[in-house]
């Protein structure tokens, strides 16, 4: 089973280098100003410039309820090659983003409050490249540390790649992946010491747990 692993909420170049050296080269940057993990376009470029070409495989900016012009303005200032929409974006808006930025991989996060929320996923099947399932929090868009009810997701098999997020840590990732077969996983608070301050030792523990499951990145 090949699986992509995204480490999200990066800010510090040295931490990004260490994480990439562990084999995790899908990196996420929070571009939502209200978030404690927010990074500016300049900070993102400092991180990406610190990485070798080999380790720059996928740099994803996380946005929420941003206008198309504002999104374009931010993307023009960075070398991001992926867009993650983590707010209340409609399928139609996602299609507009995909049309405006066809070279960027488009990920839509669905924050699940209840199992029935999964029904919303179908409307996005032909609008995005990847679906990401995250836990709902009334005040935070992500990085909440809250997990999803994994057993209730076992029948979720959309016709496009999907990633699992929500409270994943080195301690519980094996349990989650024994129950589910996502195409990717997304970790933030589970591998950090504080907002945007990644714990490289925890990332190394994550690598060891995934190696034990013989899960390789693409």
Swiss-Prot record:
It is an enzyme of class 5 (isomerase). One of its GO terms (biological process) is L-tryptophan biosynthetic process. Its EC number is 5.3.1.24. It comes from the Bacteria. GO terms for molecular function: phosphoribosylanthranilate isomerase activity. Pfam families: PRAI. It catalyses: N-(5-phospho-beta-D-ribosyl)anthranilate = 1-(2-carboxyphenylamino)-1-deoxy-D-ribulose 5-phosphate. Keywords: Amino-acid biosynthesis, Aromatic amino acid biosynthesis, Isomerase, Tryptophan biosynthesis. Pathway: Amino-acid biosynthesis; L-tryptophan biosynthesis; L-tryptophan from chorismate: step 3/5. SUPFAM superfamilies: Ribulose-phoshate binding barrel (SSF51366). The keyword Isomerase applies. Belongs to the TrpF family. This is N-(5'-phosphoribosyl)anthranilate isomerase. It comes from Synechocystis sp. (strain ATCC 27184 / PCC 6803 / Kazusa). The lineage of its organism: Bacteria, Bacillati, Cyanobacteriota, Cyanophyceae, Synechococcales.
